[in-house]
Amino acid sequence: LCDRLAAEDERIRVFHKKNGGPSSARNFGLQQAGGEYVGFVDSDDYVDADMYERLYGAIEKTGMPVAQVGRDEIDKDGNILPNICEPVATEQVIPAEGFLKELLMHRGDCSFCTKLLRKDLFTIEQFPVGALNEDFHLLVKMLTREESAVPGIACIPGQAYHVFYRPDSNTRDKNRFSRVFADNIDNADMVLALVDRKYPELSEIAFRFGIFQRLDYLLHIPIAQMTGDNAFYRRVVRDLRHGWWRAMKNPWLTKKNKLLLNRLL
């Protein structure tokens, strides 16, 4: 199908490569892209016909290198699921520090699929191959670069990107313990180090994010893997014990979070 469409429209180019995961495919696409801006659409999803036109308009209007629109998720029966991230009500520019704060509070959208980005943002670093939660990893790197490559993100209202929810995806399969929980913790440690250097006023929020990701790991790991020879599991428990007092004083952790921490330890 893709080859046939490419034969009918010279604007479409199709490449065939060995499956190396989403990051590998995206990085390959970035190497082939010839335009000034890039966007990403997952194979199961679809976008409104004017999505990229609206995103480009926001970039032109604000001068920001990145624009974002809201998304919704649709199940296999066509039902719209509750919002993961609430779209903005009005067009606005969210500064890099504010956008990062929203990500760390689990309110922001790290997906590159809802964004249009200037291609040169990927010159320094691209998607981490072999890792899950790769969008969060790269976006945080962009938001915390010393040269302030992304001073802010232009956000427009509406939900123009539509996610087809697959419960058996790499991060959602309930029948196996996804590696994403460990990758989330590694990303949390990375962002804490970056925040301490770039935005120290967000340090306690970043610490809260790391505690939250570790609690999420312990809530999902199978009992059979809670063993002394599981080095990562031992590390998670050790980190929570070492950070317990700071967590108890953290204003961004809820009472429920703190009760859960005490119960799991």
Q: Residue spans of the language-model regions?
A:
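Glycine-rich, basic loop-to-helix element that forms the pyrophosphate-binding segment
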Residues: 1, 17-33
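Acidic donor-binding segment of Leloir-type glycosyltransferases
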Residues: 1-16
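Short aromatic/hydrophobic "clamp" motif used to bind/position activated sugar donors
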Residues: 38
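The conserved acidic donor/metal-binding loop of glycosyltransferases
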Residues: 42-46, 65
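Conserved donor NDP-sugar-binding/catalytic core segment of glycosyltransferases
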Residues: 50-83
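Membrane-interface aromatic/basic loop that binds lipid-linked glycans or pyrophosphate carriers
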Residues: 64, 223-265
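Short, flexible, basic/aromatic active-site loop/helix in glycosyltransferases
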Residues: 70, 86-107
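Conserved nucleotide-sugar donor-binding catalytic segment
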Residues: 97-184
